[in-house]
Amino acid sequence: MLQPKRTKFRKQQKGRNYGLASRGNAVSFGEYGLKAVTRGPITARQIEAGRRAINRHVKRGGKVWIRVFPDKPITAKPLEVRQGKGKGNVDHWAFPVQPGRVLYEIEGVSEELAREAFRRAAAKLPVRTTFVQRTVL
């Protein structure tokens, strides 16, 4: 699963996820993309589940890019532990998705195959998504 090799600090504050994606909002590498429409955190497990769903559907054809990386540590205290005594340990890693962010890209497959692969990946994700094509300028 995806997670940083090393970080400057082990834990982060929760923060807030405002605004629209100003970076990573265009299809850059492949022909087709899966773009987020709503906001929310996506965990490393969800990113991996979506990647597996895409790869299983396209089989050996096409190339897939993952355009998000979970670099935000999410902490949790153990079950049945009283509050206080400091912040909990890192439980998992997540990526805060903003509307307009491209999550996955694919090339080398037909549009119908890409649509179906992204539909299956979208079922694994906690945000609503839409299918986008690369725009040639």
Curated annotation (Swiss-Prot):
Spell out the molecular function terms from Gene Ontology: rRNA binding; structural constituent of ribosome; tRNA binding
Q: Which Pfam families does its entry note? A: Ribosomal_L16
Q: Which GO terms describe its biological process?
A: translation
State whether keyword Metal-binding applies. no
Q: Which domain of life is it from?
A: Bacteria
Q: Which InterPro entries match?
A: Ribosomal_uL16, Ribosomal_uL16_bact-type, Ribosomal_uL16_CS, Ribosomal_uL16_dom, Ribosomal_uL16_sf
Gene3D superfamilies registered for this protein in UniProt: Ribosomal protein L10e/L16
Physiological role: Binds 23S rRNA and is also seen to make contacts with the A and possibly P site tRNAs.
Q: How does it assemble?
A: Part of the 50S ribosomal subunit.
Matching entries from HAMAP family are given as:
Ribosomal_uL16
| The name this protein goes by in its record | Large ribosomal subunit protein uL16
Native source organism of the sequence: Alkalilimnicola ehrlichii (strain ATCC BAA-1101 / DSM 17681 / MLHE-1)
